[in-house]
Every structure is written in structure tokens, then in C-alpha cells.
UniProtKB/Swiss-Prot annotation:
Organism the protein comes from: Berne virus
Described function: Major structural component of virions that associates with genomic RNA.
A Pfam family of this chain: Nucleocapsid-N
Location in the cell: Virion; Host nucleus, Host nucleoplasm; Host nucleus, Host nucleolus
Region (involved in nuclear and nucleolar localization): 31-60
Protein family (similarity comment): Belongs to the toroviruses nucleocapsid protein family.
Descriptive protein name: Nucleoprotein
Keywords attached to this entry: Host nucleus, Ribonucleoprotein, RNA-binding, Viral nucleoprotein, Virion
Composition skew (Low complexity), residue ranges: 46-83
Segments for region (Disordered): 44-88
One GO CC term on file: ribonucleoprotein complex
Length: 160
């Protein structure tokens, strides 16, 4: 009947079913953020009920200072626990790590003909340059013009 009155009318089509999707926040935006605000939060009337703003600012500062102190103590405690055993000197530990890195290194196929002990020495020298941080030592052949150089090191330091 509608179509008779209105020649341009489209025959009745049900609206597509809308399935409720969970809200997707942009990355780094926590969903808990919305819950912290009181439901009557209205940005236009924000300054309605905060009394003396200066006093509240001082209180906030005091709270921050308390937290800071607590964190400092906790960090010192952790540092004391995490200290490496003093039985082995730092250089020895570094040498050990260098050995492990050297043996774990993978060498390109064109370097397989070099004596493995020499390769390990090269890798160890490279690993000794890494004092902190996890690193992968890639060993590649020297450039064509410098044949006397056995290998060049590219040391990637990966932050943990």
C-alpha cells in the first residue's frame, strides 16, 4: 500500500541484525580508566566541589613522597638479593658468558672451512665487547677488498 502512495518507496527490508561487539580501545588505553571516574562526572562543572585546591595539591605531594620512599627501600632490598655470587670475579663471569655466546653463534656457510677454534676465538673477542644486555653476535666475512680480515662483527644488543 505504501508503494502505491509513494512511487519511490523501497519494499520493506528488515534492518540488518547488529551483534553487540565488545568495545575496542586503542592500544595503550586501559578499559579500567572509565571505571575510576564517578558517574556524575561533568567536565563543565569540574571545579564545583574541590574546596581549597591549594590544600589538596599539598596533600597529593605528601602522598607521592611517601610512595617514593617505599619504592626506594624496596629497590635496595631487591638489589641486595639479586647480587651475583662474589665467589667468581666479574671478568670470569664475562669470560664464561663470552664462551657460551661463542659456542652458540651460528656461522654463515662460506665460513665453515675456517678452523672452528679460530671461529670461537673470534666470537669470544666479539662477545667480550658486550658488557651488559643480551646480545647476538653475527659473524660475517670481511669485505672483498680486505682479504686479510677474517671476519667483521655486527653486534646487536637486544634490550630485555
Amino acid at each position: 500500500m505504501n508503494s502505491m502512495l509513494n512511487p519511490n518507496a523501497v519494499p520493506f527490508q528488515p534492518s540488518p541484525q547488529v551483534v553487540a561487539l565488545p568495545m575496542q580501545y586503542p592500544s595503550g588505553f586501559s578499559s579500567g580508566y572509565r571505571r575510576q571516574r564517578d558517574p556524575a562526572f561533568r567536565p563543565m562543572f569540574r571545579r564545583q566541589n574541590n574546596g581549597n585546591q591549594n590544600r589538596s595539591r599539598q596533600n597529593r605531594q605528601r602522598l607521592q613522597n611517601n610512595n617514593r620512599g617505599n619504592n626506594r627501600n624496596r629497590n635496595q632490598f631487591n638489589r641486595r638479593q639479586n647480587q651475583p655470587s662474589q665467589s667468581m670475579s666479574f671478568e670470569q663471569q664475562l669470560l664464561l658468558m663470552a664462551n657460551e655466546t661463542a659456542y652458540a653463534a651460528t656461522y654463515p656457510s662460506d665460513m665453515q672451512n675456517i678452523a672452528p677454534t679460530k671461529l670461537v676465538k673470534i666470537a669470544k673477542r666479539a662477545a667480550m665487547q658486550i658488557v651488559s644486555g643480551h646480545a647476538t653476535v653475527e659473524i660475517s666475512n670481511g669485505t672483498e677488498d680486505s682479504n686479510q680480515r677474517v671476519a667483521t662483527f655486527t653486534i646487536k644488543v637486544v634490550m630485555n
